């Protein structure tokens, strides 16, 4: 009985971990950390023609597209969205999970600025 409970708990933990995948860890071929501090993590993302990633997630982010490109995003529920993105385009992305794919015949590159969770502001000092 105890062994079964331990196995069940381990399976739940592994399933939860698999659902919350960091792009840099699960797909280092396409995702490179350029800069990181307590407020943001800045990623350079590069896909060759017709390359795709694996399912992963990002926090709320701002994307800056460096090249034109055609892409397809698949969400965990199987829905897909196709887009044509232009060099210089800037886009807000809510936090979420997806599997991205470069559907074009040319390399596709962007910078993604991931926002880290904000801490509550410190209380101002008060005079005594």
Q: Language-model segments: which ranges?
A:
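A short glycine-rich, His/Asp/Glu-containing loop-to-beta-strand
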Residues: 27-54, 59-63, 113
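Bacterial N-terminal signal peptides
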Residues: 7-15
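Histidine-centered metal-chelating micro-motifs
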Residues: 50-53, 89-101
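Sec/Tat signal peptide C-region and signal peptidase I cleavage site
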Residues: 16-20
